């Protein structure tokens, strides 16, 4: 038997060193994995819990919930309850504490970025929860009473389960509206009652959006669209003819016996709250209204700039736009006589499909192509019942996992043809919301990123982009008109762009005046008079709209200015390597996010290869 040699001191030291190194590596890897595992567990729980708590929201986020771990859910509308709101606040505090216990440096780069976004978002949510009755879910501008029917009408049916979920949600609309009425009653008791004039507007909407006459004649859009959505399921034999008939009967019954009475009960309840002594006023008139406005501004726009700095940005941009308007008018003096004329017939395109095709062609060199197959879009008109209460146009966001079919709604009562329709389609379609959404969703899935990111919403990021590309579309239109030999019309398109920018800038400044500085109607009317708005009714409409929708104009226009600021910084950082294509790809790849996070991302951003693999080139 061979005798073992004794271990030398040097060998012993080497062995101990190896063991210590190995142990350190194990602890190091364990530490990293522990933080990653905790983050994965927390975010998975957040995502599934959020999806299960609101089926309507889940359906618009996910086509196939089970593929994202959302199973065994019960169809539910998220009804208001004061105790539930307090419980939700406590859950948010616990989640935030759990996230802050995680060390972001020990997460992967995508998870570390998400950690930052989640913590900032939850901090803002908690800050806003300290103002329980400042929010207005029944705003006359875009409240639940007008938004819910659209969401129901566009609720896609891919499976039998989708139809049954939809009917279950429709059956809960009475409880849902009743809970909103409770909120309004609690709000009134707390001294935050909605002005009587606004309550009258909401009641009028309740009386006209769903009517007995339309339901009795089977002409209401919630009847006709339901039948249209069932047809493909019947054709593909996902449901039988007998099942389709039963579903149709059930839908009619619920519309007549649940939704219609729900609207009536809501309107009657709001009537009891009307107090003619309560007049429209900004948030600054409320206790701690300025503090709430500051927090709401962060939430709605994603900008963390102080209000004084925002006012400075707006004032400087206003002066710039004003000077540009003067230059155009001086260069093309003949343009003045065309300003008040209807030029829609002279615009080269009248069909929305032609306009979208032209937009896609002109944007091709400056925007990354969509990954994967083409995304179809259907342009629809808003139902006549909803025209008075809807925005001029809107894009219904496609689910994360199904971007094949997309819908853009045009409110024909507020959006004429010609140049305005062209730029509106750019805002809502290409290169606006539709393009931004499809690009994000497909890249997100291809990269296998954490679905909890889909819980985050950044209005300034989205609407700022849509306004940014809308202004690009005015340039596209000017080029198109020049190609057609319409030089004056091309100059007019440039003037329209500058005028729209000036108007949105002015309204954004007025938003701050009303909600932060407590400007009265008389003060705002005087300002508007200086800019040509001499009709007192028009001034009142502008004032009321801004009172009803604080930060709404800023969501668009401050978002737009933040993008311009990022773009200017990118030019400085990248120097000769800067192109609009690279900047647009940065913005799309690093978002959605708040602008503070986007600025941080820009500092370390490396310009990638120009064309992603397996992409759909624009025509």
Language-model segments: which ranges?
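Short, Lys/Arg-rich, polar N-terminal cytosolic tail immediately upstream
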Residues: 1-2
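N-terminal maturation segment of proteins
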Residues: 6-619
């Amino acid at each position: 038997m061979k005798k073992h040699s004794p271990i030398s001191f040097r060998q012993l030291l080497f062995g101990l060193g190896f063991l210590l190194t190995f142990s350190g590596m194990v602890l190091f890897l364990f530490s990293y994995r522990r933080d990653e595992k905790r983050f994965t567990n927390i975010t998975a729980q957040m995502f599934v819990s959020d999806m299960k708590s609101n089926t309507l929201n889940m359906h618009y986020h996910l086509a196939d919930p089970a593929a994202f771990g959302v199973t065994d859910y019960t169809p539910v509308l998220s009804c208001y309850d004061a105790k539930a709101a307090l419980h939700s606040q406590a859950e948010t505090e616990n989640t935030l504490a759990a996230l802050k216990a995680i060390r972001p440096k020990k997460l992967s780069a995508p998870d570390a970025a998400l950690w930052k976004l989640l913590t900032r978002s939850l901090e803002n949510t908690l800050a806003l929860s300290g103002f329980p009755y400042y929010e207005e879910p029944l705003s006359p501008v875009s409240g639940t009473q007008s938004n819910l029917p659209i969401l129901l009408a566009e609720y896609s049916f891919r499976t039998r389960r989708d139809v049954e979920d939809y009917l279950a949600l429709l059956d809960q609309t009475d409880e849902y509206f009743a809970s909103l009425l409770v909120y309004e009653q609690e709000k009134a008791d707390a001294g935050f009652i909605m002005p009587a004039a606004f309550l009258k507007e909401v009641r009028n909407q309740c009386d006209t959006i769903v009517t007995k006459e339309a339901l009795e004649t089977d002409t209401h859009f919630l009847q006709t669209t339901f039948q249209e959505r069932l047809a493909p399921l019947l054709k593909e034999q996902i449901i039988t003819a007998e099942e389709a008939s039963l579903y149709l009967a059930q839908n009619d019954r619920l519309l007549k016996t649940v939704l219609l009475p729900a609207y009536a009960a809501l309107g009657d309840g709001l009537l009891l709250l009307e107090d003619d002594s309560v007049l429209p006023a900004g948030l600054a008139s409320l206790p701690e209204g300025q503090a709430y406005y500051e927090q709401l501004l962060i939430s709605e726009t994603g900008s963390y700039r102080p209000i004084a700095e925002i006012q400075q940005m707006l004032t400087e941009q206003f002066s710039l736009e004003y000077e540009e308007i003067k230059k155009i008018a001086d260069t093309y003096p003949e343009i003045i006589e065309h300003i008040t004329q209807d030029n829609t017939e002279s615009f080269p395109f009248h069909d929305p499909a032609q306009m979208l095709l032209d937009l896609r062609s002109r944007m091709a060199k400056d925007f990354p192509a969509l990954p994967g197959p083409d995304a179809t879009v259907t342009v629809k008109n808003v139902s006549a019942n909803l025209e008075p209460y809807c925005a001029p146009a809107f894009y219904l966001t496609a689910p994360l996992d199904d971007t094949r079919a997309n819908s853009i709604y045009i409110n024909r009562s507020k959006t004429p043809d010609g140049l305005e329709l062209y730029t509106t389609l750019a805002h809502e379609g290409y290169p606006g919301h539709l393009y931004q959404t499809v690009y994000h969703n497909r890249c997100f899935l291809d990269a296998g990123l954490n679905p909890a990111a889909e819980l985050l919403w950044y209005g300034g990021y989205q609407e700022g982009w849509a306004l940014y590309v809308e202004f690009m579309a005015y340039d596209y239109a000017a080029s198109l008109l020049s190609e057609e030999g319409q030089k004056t019309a091309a100059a007019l398109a440039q003037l329209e762009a500058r005028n729209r920018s000036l108007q949105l800038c002015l309204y954004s400044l007025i938003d701050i005046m009303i909600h932060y500085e407590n400007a009265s109607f008389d003060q705002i009317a005087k300002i508007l008079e200086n800019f040509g708005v001499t009709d007192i009714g028009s001034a009142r409409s502008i004032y009321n709209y801004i009172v009803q929708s604080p930060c709404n104009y800023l969501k668009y226009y401050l978002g737009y200015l933040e993008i311009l600021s990022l773009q200017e910084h990118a030019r400085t950082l990248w120097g000769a390597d800067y192109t609009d294509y690279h900047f647009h790809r940065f913005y799309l790849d690093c978002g959605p996010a708040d602008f503070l996070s986007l600025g941080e991302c820009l500092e370390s951003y490396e310009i990638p290869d120009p064309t992603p693999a397996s992409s759909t080139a624009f025509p």
